[in-house]
Amino acid sequence: PAAQEPAAVAAAAAPSDSGRPAPKGAAVVSAARPWQPPPIRGQISAQYLSVNGRDSLTSDLTQPAFYVRLDGHNLGGSPLGLLLDARTRMTTTQPVGGTVSTQDNVTRVYLGALLYNAPGSSLRLTLGRQYSPVISSVSYFDGLLAEVVKAGWSVGVLGGLQPDPATLKFSTDIQEGGLYFQLHNRPASTTNWSFTLGGIGSYTQGQPNREFAFLQGTYNSRALSLFAVQELDFYRGDKAALGEPPVSPTNSLVNLSLRVTDAVTLSAGFDDRRNVRLYRDIVTPLTQFDDAFRTGAWGGAAVLVARRLRFGADVHSTLKDPTTQGNIYSAYFSTDRFSPLHLNIRARSSRYDNNQMAGWLHSGTLGVSPTPWVQVEANVGTRNDERSTSSLGLNHVTWYGASVDLSVARAWFLNFSFTREDGTIGKNDQAYGMITFRF
């Protein structure tokens, strides 16, 4: 809602809308100013992770971390803005059986850029550490992105340097440049869609590091949601001399969701991307399992009953990697804000069978939100290998834990969680806390 100024009481006569002086002592209400968003929005977060090993295989670890994100536009009424996403952490590890701990201090800047976009202008400039929100194939780079954005189309050109892939520190080893052209829906359209075509080239000491073209499409309506990207790599120079074909399709990703009726939804997808950068505050056996079997093709269906109960099943086939080729069959159930306590229940059961291993994974979560600003969850899970070619043998692991989320005054957010893991190849207790201020 629009913020209003308090009414001002005039001690003397003041002009009224009719032009006549208002009676002495009459209240004059000043005009309400339209609400304006603050020029800079963002969040500041402090986090702490502790892992305590309870066997001879797991090291102890402590990791305090700090995170800041800023997003500013039209600073001081100017066409300038800024983006900042920086994270720092200090990791202390106590090796198993060791008396000397090791410490690793890391500070990484994921975004650090100046923006230029004059009101009413179609030209947008971004200078600094960034990634392209339009081109999913482009990772971080230090340089300039120039875009012209019109009602039904846009075009962009970028150039700069790739940071060190391991540390994200500034580096001049790899130079990068590219361009794209995009057709998209007009602002008043009820359906969001886009089609993007472009090419990117990166070079090391004048030699090709990677050259590729890409096609990317998105479509979102009430019934259909689609995201698809296909990259096409070109090989020449040293890579061609090593026997690579001149042109090769690489890095395909498709995500499709079709709402057949209000109660039935179908989903399908395909992912053979080689490298995906993942961000995890907490790693559990469940996230490790899903990350390990990310690639492949999948399809499934979900049914909504009584607007609160969701039942679903899917099958995931890992087709590309012969070492993990096989299938994962999953069934799941969930509820959303069920009963006056706003119960949230999620349960999942997965059967996996591939060239390396076979077994079962089960997990469940029970959450309750007694108030809009408090949420409490408890979780439990187990994974049991029936067959494995790993040198560590069969993996049998169980885990359970709890978390609490608190929201204070719509600006402060607190999260606390604890997880205990008991497995044949590792036992540990994991505690995590976070406090975030949003403005």
Give the positions of each predicted feature:
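Gram-negative and organellar
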Residues: A3-F439
